Amino acid sequence: MGVATLPAGGLNWLAVWRRNYLAWKKAALASILGNLADPVIYLFGLGAGLGVMVGRVDGVSYTAFLAAGMIATSAMTAATFETIYAAFGRMQGQRTWEAMLYTQLTQGDIVVGEMAWAATKASLAGTGIGIVAAMLGYTHWLALLYALPVIAITGLAFASLGMVVTALAPSYDYFIFYQTLVITPMLFLSGAVFPVDQLPVAFQQIAAFLPLAHSIDLIRPTMLGQPIANVCLHIGVLCIYIVVPFLVSTALLRRRLMR
């Protein structure tokens, strides 16, 4: 991996973050509401419907159980959509990244800046769901504050994965495969909607490798005031999903942008 592929050092990536922020704030309200729509629909739809039939899960109401899962899910969704659709547009259609490379920025700076911006949007989305849950009495405000670092790390992990997909995709059409074959199954296998231990053993083993499952295992106990098991393991797995895809995407983008 060449030097130009890695971040140049310092805070150069902040220029990328700031550029994306300035473009986003023109339509900030619509963006925030869009990121909240799906998780809120899941929360009220499944919570009100299944909650009556299911009752309590792991000692708490099903809606409280679901709310914690939707916080992680909203962070995943926001980071994913930002790094595949929006970032791809900046790379392919607008050719913003190409223009950035004529400055002192490297591919690594661009990737770090895009990941940081996606994690910011993920944090806003996850916090938004958390605020709704706290207002409805399904968690405490202080618990939401404790969960913020995990929400941000979750955003970084899925942003890093999304950058790999963006680096590989020849067009927007290919993102549907990532959504339907990776993101949607992960939602149902990671314990967001129902406990992982209710799945067949084979699916439980798959869930053990999924970043969303580790995020939920950190966020849910925090939101519900329960002890957190295997904290170092969960954080370690999420960090792997941040670092390894980052290295892969920077290498792939070097070849793609230098053609």
UniProtKB/Swiss-Prot annotation:
It comes from the Bacteria. GO terms for molecular function: ABC-type transporter activity. Residues 30-256 form the ABC transmembrane type-2 domain. The complex is composed of two ATP-binding proteins (NodI) and two transmembrane proteins (NodJ). The keyword Transmembrane applies. It is a multi-pass membrane protein. PANTHER family: NODULATION PROTEIN J (PTHR43229:SF2). GO terms for biological process: oligosaccharide transport. It comes from Rhizobium leguminosarum bv. viciae. Part of the ABC transporter complex NodIJ involved in the export of the nodulation factors (Nod factors), the bacterial signal molecules that induce symbiosis and subsequent nodulation induction. Nod factors are LCO (lipo-chitin oligosaccharide), a modified beta-1,4-linked N-acetylglucosamine oligosaccharide. This subunit encodes the transporter. Belongs to the ABC-2 integral membrane protein family. Lipooligosaccharide exporter (TC 3.A.1.102) subfamily. The chain crosses the membrane at residues 32-52, 64-84, 116-136, 141-161, 174-194, 228-248. This is Nodulation protein J. InterPro entries: ABC2_TM, ABC2_TM_bact-type, ABC_2_transport, ABC_transptNodJ, Nod_factor_ABC_transporter. Keywords: Cell inner membrane, Cell membrane, Membrane, Nodulation, Plasmid, Transmembrane, Transmembrane helix, Transport. It is found in: Cell inner membrane. One of its GO terms (cellular component) is ATP-binding cassette (ABC) transporter complex.
